[in-house]
Amino acid sequence: MSQFSLEMYVLLSLPAFFIGISRGGLGGGFALAAAIISAQIFEPIKAAAFLLPLLIISDPLSVWIYRKNIYWNSIKILLPGIILGVVLTFFLINKISSAMISIIVGFLAIFLAVDGLTRKLVKAPKKKLHPTIGVFLGAIGGFSSFVIHSGLPPIAAYLLPLKLTRQKFMGTVALIFAITNIVKLFPYFLLGLFDKELIKLTLTFIPITFLGIFVGKFINNKISDQVFFFIIYTSVFFLGLRLIWFSI
């Protein structure tokens, strides 16, 4: 860790804090921001490896906070697809372009955001997508989560039309990605993404991540459902734009 300057430690504290905020209740846009900042210091896949232990360590607290607000029916549909996506990514990681999947996820995110905001304006009724679509979206979420820790857009594409409360939305997302991150751990090891120095560096930022969780939860409790989902849709929209822009 001696090769890191004080400025780099300060810079890396931001993604650690953003990981906590995303787990505390303000959505996956912050997790992507964490990956982007980390990629300024590490190569992208190494940045993902730096963040994964922080995600795994913070996930149990996030799940515990929202433990009474989990929509189990969606878990049963999305999780098999996510696991399939993670497994396929492990075998195909050296054969497919992460830029291409980022573009696909980006367009999906934009479509989701525009559709969601339109539904809010016209007060569209609750809509449940076919389970096959849920498995497909889960697989895309597993892929994008594996590569850039940004699995929220396809998962949100399935959950948001259900018009869940923000607490139930967060509880469901928290459990889904807690399981997803554990599933990703073994493939990351097999790909040789972890080393002793990187793990020691990551563990340094655990307190900052936990602080972010409580800050995210505090903010989540202070805003209405309307404001929360506006933040989610807006962040997903700009997240999609950014994924496309930097992948072209």
Residue ranges and their predicted role:
Residues 9-77, 137-142, 152-206:
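Small-residue-rich hydrophobic segments that form or flank transmembrane alpha-helices
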Residues 47, 89-92, 142-150, 184, ...:
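Hydrophobic alpha-helical transmembrane segments in multi-pass integral membrane proteins
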Residues 56, 60, 79-87, 117, ...:
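Hydrophobic/small/kink-forming positions within alpha-helical transmembrane segments
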Residues 59-67, 104-129, 218, 238-248:
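Transmembrane helix exit motif
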Residues 63-77, 93-103, 123-128, 194-199, ...:
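Interfacial helix-loop-helix linkers and transmembrane-helix boundary segments
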Residues 72-82, 104-106, 128-138, 168-175, ...:
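Cytoplasmic-side transmembrane-helix entry/capping segments in multi-pass membrane proteins
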Residues 169, 214-236:
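Interfacial loop-to-transmembrane junctions
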